[in-house]
Amino acid sequence: MLYLGVIGYPIKHSVSPAMHNAALQHEGIEGIYLAFEVKPDRLRDAVFGAKALGFRGLNVTIPFKESVVEFVELEGEAAKIKTVNTIDLVEMVGYNTDVYGVKAALSGTELGGKTALVVGAGGAGKAAALALLDMGSTVIVANRTEEKGREAVEMLRRYGECIFWPLSRVEELKGKVDVVVNATPLGMRGFKAEIPVPPSMLDGVELVFDTVYNPMETPLIREAKKRGCKVVYGIEMLVHQGAKAFEIWTGIEPDVGVMREAALRALRF
């Protein structure tokens, strides 16, 4: 029996169990994927408790993607941005499949030479920024707290052209960016139903990508559509990062279509 799970706080919004359980069933693997709400002061207990119980792997979501790095060895992109969203509990290795998820979600868009604004400098923000740098974009990271934003940029600038911009002055970038990415929880079910930038900033922007997937139609996505921007839904990043995590745990490339359909079904309820 294969035991997998996701830890976060809050976690009720997660559709990862529906998505991964559908993949397990489709591949004929006897296993189960469960969601666990973990209080911030119990992270270590949760990780090592899952290992002790024989879990093969965990996904890690808000607010643990950065704090969990102290418990695992870092591999690939996780080592570059000190952010983990997938753990192999047998080897105690942390991976970042969010970077892969962002690249797959944005694969239909030519991003070389574009200027992208990433709002948020946490785990999702650093993953989105690294993906965009790898795809040839210049990246501006805007964050509410300057120290955290500058720390992220210091980490990212060795992989491409990346600068910090205070979120309080983000309106000054109007007309200067081609892509806007929300990598904050704003708009997520259970968080404030707001958008991370002034609506007028979206005028003339080519592409808007919201990493939030629940609800699918976030306030930012709705505003971007109204203003004629191409939009990419967070569900695409979710599905592709999940597929890569599944492959790490099982050695099998799952059917992305099966995972997407299961995630969409779960979002409707």
From Swiss-Prot:
Annotated CDD domains: NAD_bind_Shikimate_DH
GO biological process: amino acid biosynthetic process; aromatic amino acid family biosynthetic process; chorismate biosynthetic process; shikimate metabolic process
Domain of life: Archaea
Pathway: Metabolic intermediate biosynthesis; chorismate biosynthesis; chorismate from D-erythrose 4-phosphate and phosphoenolpyruvate: step 4/7
Enzyme nomenclature, EC number: 1.1.1.25
Annotated residues for binding of shikimate: S14, V15, S16, T61, N85, D98, Y213
Keywords: Amino-acid biosynthesis, Aromatic amino acid biosynthesis, NADP, Oxidoreductase
GO molecular function: NADP binding; shikimate 3-dehydrogenase (NADP+) activity
Active-site annotation: K65 (proton acceptor)
Catalytic activity: shikimate + NADP(+) = 3-dehydroshikimate + NADPH + H(+)
Binding site for NADP(+): G120, A121, G122, G123, A124, N143, R144, T145, E146, E147, K148, T211, G234
Enzyme class: oxidoreductase
Family classification: Belongs to the shikimate dehydrogenase family.
Function noted in UniProt: Involved in the biosynthesis of the chorismate, which leads to the biosynthesis of aromatic amino acids. Catalyzes the reversible NADPH linked reduction of 3-dehydroshikimate (DHSA) to yield shikimate (SA).
Assembly mode: Homodimer.
Protein name per Swiss-Prot or TrEMBL: Shikimate dehydrogenase (NADP(+))
Protein source organism: Archaeoglobus fulgidus (strain ATCC 49558 / DSM 4304 / JCM 9628 / NBRC 100126 / VC-16)
